[in-house]
Amino acid sequence: MKVLFVTSEAYPLVKTGGLGDVAGALPAALRDIGVDARILLPAYPDAMRRARLTGKTVPLGNPLGVGETRLLEGTMPDTGCPLWLLDCPAMYERTGGPYMMYSGVDWPDNFRRFALLSKVAAMIGTAGDLMDWRPDVLHGHDWQTGLVPAYLNAWGARRPPFLFSIHNMEYRGLFGPEILDLIGLPRSQFSINGLEFHGLVSTLKAGIVYAQAVATVSPSYAAEIKTPVGGQGLEGLLQARAGDLSGILNGIDSNAWNPQTDPYLAAPIDGADPAPGKRINKDMLKRRMGLDADGDRPLFGLVSRFVAQKGIDLVVAALPGMIAGGAQVAILGAGDTGLEAALNDIVGRYPGAAAVHVGYDEHLAHLIEGAADFLLVPSRFEPCGLTQLYALRYGTIPVVRRTGGLADSVSHLDDGPNGTGIVFDHALPDALEWAIGRAMTLYRDKATLNKVRQRGMSQDFSWKRSAKEYLRVYGSMVGGDVHRP
């Protein structure tokens, strides 16, 4: 089985969020179970610096009329997974992020940049002599690759089949209809049964419409996006594609996130008895973040973007009561300046009980995951989520809202003998405060606390598990008829 991953980011070459983690780790996990998985990624400056290039190039001419284009062969620096960088200096050789300028404004030619990625992926899939390698399946990710099957549809190509993975429905890839002429797609696709969405082109919709199969990053999120709450206006289409829609929970990199060998921890954490290692790491985190070291107090961690989706406003509302009840809080993240200011205000009012580090620090992220007694993940919606998976692996008990991947990965400790965390239902301050109170009650029962930690650490959230599920989807696509709208 040969699979080409088409993606706009892949860790450690370039990453802005969870998509980068998936696209970096899943191909390697698939290769471990016998799949010939390879990655196609734009040749951003960071990717060019970090990839291990072989020196082999394949000229592609000027397939989109935006400049000379070529493929650069290489491998991923950490896993050795085969890689092709799509080199078009006019599109990708620029300072800033993969999607935005340093100012935070989207690149105005994003439609061209990712149409080129999509068109070249379709070319690789249909031109057997292009790379001396032809994929059995094309696997694209999010709106940036939604035009891959649109090109295949326009060319009348029935193979290879395309799997479209949705990591976040909020990003729909919306552009004016005039782009179709500029990127070489027929106007006939601009219809309610094609890629038209309220008078605009939606590349996310294109992926859903023209792909043979659709996947998302957790079973619960697959159900949620078929409803008005989660579907972002595309729920009817997703209901129609329900038979082709899979929800596969993301995995984690069990080498990078290994509580026995993590170099960022002050001491290893043993799944058979997490308490001693947790205690040492907790002491280290308190010293690093300036939290009071005296007393046996529950420590809550939060590692998150500071945005409304993540429920940070709920945390702001709950913090004074938590601290009054004897808890301490260690927070890492960045985002909305108003939420940053609110968190910093609480730190100023409760020195020694609350600490915030604004920004991202990989060392501190690992230390919080390993040191905290509980991890707060009160998201309003969460397609999958990774921090709760890291927490479980490190013996930290997640406090999560019942949504998306949080619901699939954390079971409430009062719902049966195998509970691994504390789960609440509503995105309201009172609901989070109830969950925090339940956590503080658990903390006082040290024997039960350690058992819940042990259960969490015994869970399997490896990419190998996820890779086997994707392999089953690929197999069904290769053996079945290709969906056409």
From Swiss-Prot:
Q: Does the keyword Ligase apply?
A: no
Give the Pfam families listed for this entry.
Answer: Glyco_transf_5, Glycos_transf_1
* Pathway(s) where this gene product acts: Glycan biosynthesis; glycogen biosynthesis
Q: Source organism's superkingdom?
A: Bacteria
Question: CDD domains of this UniProt entry?
Answer: GT5_Glycogen_synthase_DULL1-like
What this protein catalyses is: [(1->4)-alpha-D-glucosyl](n) + ADP-alpha-D-glucose = [(1->4)-alpha-D-glucosyl](n+1) + ADP + H(+)
What protein family does this chain belong to?
Belongs to the glycosyltransferase 1 family. Bacterial/plant glycogen synthase subfamily.
> What is the documented function of this protein?
Synthesizes alpha-1,4-glucan chains using ADP-glucose.
Q: Which NCBIfam families match?
A: glgA, PRK00654.1-2
Which protein is depicted?
Answer: Glycogen synthase
Q: Which organism is it from?
A: Rhodospirillum rubrum (strain ATCC 11170 / ATH 1.1.1 / DSM 467 / LMG 4362 / NCIMB 8255 / S1)
